[in-house]
């Protein structure tokens, strides 16, 4: 019996390792946990909006049957870690990972401040800007929007597995065998601490550990006629770019959104928070030299910053105090924002 179960599990893992990287909903294996998520999306958001590639790429490649086959108590073996496209602690990626890569998620929390080894952190030029800078023909500094975390192609766990893992730092480190004081162990500590911190005034937040959890939160905050947007390609980072055509989503009216930012964790975790009183823009990003389009960017402008922490990186970069100025930033490659479907 045990031999038969082990053989079946090995076959499932081989299948998972051979699954194609998803690009379109139709290409997601119908027996995978990712396909289950696509069907869940269609039930919860019935507006026939396309499923963007950047979201599909995060879905679990595991066959749906694997999650029900895992033993109890749950254990994550190296083979499961690889086949589920998780960030395994013994991978080459983690040996070269910078100790500060996971700070960017905090950057977009209202309450974020330099509290965790941030003393010598340099804020990326162009990461924050004024709303008036987002104008066709302007030449601005584009920050490095290529999120280092996305290079590892990590995935969400199936919800049935993620829900079985206590969202506690010691439990996660034990489950994944993380050594103390390693980059990943420190990131787990920081992520859990940020997720468990109290929300700022006017903010509703949730750290989501599955794609279904993210969908639920976005629908709860905005309703079911929504779409998710992100910067399309990581072109133009760290250099001056020209702003092309700019479109205000929903006519540029003040609205609300749910923004989600990736945290460094053994499996995919996003810090999602409701963002009231914002304007969302889509902008063409052009080469200064050729004037040719090299990217499509999504930017959010926060109209009311009165509830933000006075030590927030935006005020360090732009000056001013909470409530004095509007603050805009690009949605980084790897982050995303959910908004009400555009009617304009």
UniProtKB/Swiss-Prot annotation:
Residues 1-25 form the signal peptide. Expressed in roots, stems, leaves and panicles. InterPro entries: BURP_dom, PG-associated_BURP. Keywords: Glycoprotein, Signal. The keyword Plastid does not apply. Glycans are attached at residues 90, 120, 181, 333. Residues 128-341 form the BURP domain. Pfam families: BURP. The keyword Lyase does not apply. SMART domains: BURP. This is BURP domain-containing protein 16. It comes from Oryza sativa subsp. japonica.
């Amino acid at each position: 019996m045990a031999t038969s179960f082990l053989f079946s599990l090995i076959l499932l893992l081989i299948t998972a390792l051979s699954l194609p990287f998803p690009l379109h909903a139709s290409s997601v294996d119908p027996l995978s946990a990712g396909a289950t998520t696509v069907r869940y999306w269609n039930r919860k958001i019935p507006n026939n909006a396309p499923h963007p590639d950047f979201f599909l790429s995060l879905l679990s490649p595991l066959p749906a049957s694997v999650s029900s086959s895992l033993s109890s108590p749950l254990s994550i073996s190296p083979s499961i870690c690889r086949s589920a496209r998780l960030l395994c602690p013994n991978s080459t990626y983690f040996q070269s990972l910078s100790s500060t890569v996971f700070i960017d998620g905090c950057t977009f929390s209202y309450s974020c401040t330099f509290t965790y080894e941030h003393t010598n952190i340099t804020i990326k030029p162009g990461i924050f800007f004024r709303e008036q800078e987002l104008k066709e023909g302007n030449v601005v500094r584009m920050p490095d929007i290529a999120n280092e975390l996305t290079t590892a192609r990590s995935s969400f766990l199936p919800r049935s597995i993620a829900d079985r893992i206590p969202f506690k730092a010691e439990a996660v480190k034990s489950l994944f065998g993380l050594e103390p004081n390693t980059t990943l162990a420190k990131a787990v500590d920081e992520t859990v601490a940020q997720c468990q911190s109290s929300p700022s005034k006017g903010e509703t937040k949730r750290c989501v550990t599955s794609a279904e959890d993210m969908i639920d939160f976005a629908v709860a905050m905005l309703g079911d006629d929504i779409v998710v947007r992100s910067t399309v390609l990581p072109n133009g980072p760290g250099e001056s770019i020209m702003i092309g055509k700019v479109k205000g989503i929903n006519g540029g009216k003040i609205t609300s959104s749910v923004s989600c930012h990736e945290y460094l964790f053994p499996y995919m975790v996003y810090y999602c928070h409701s963002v009231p009183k914002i304007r969302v823009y889509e902008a063409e990003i052009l080469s200064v030299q050729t004037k040719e389009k090299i990217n499509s960017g999504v930017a959010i402008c926060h109209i009311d910053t009165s509830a933000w922490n006075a030590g927030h990186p935006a005020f360090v970069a732009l000056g001013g105090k909470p409530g004095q100025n509007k603050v805009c930033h690009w949605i980084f490659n790897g982050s995303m924002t959910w908004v009400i479907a555009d009617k304009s």
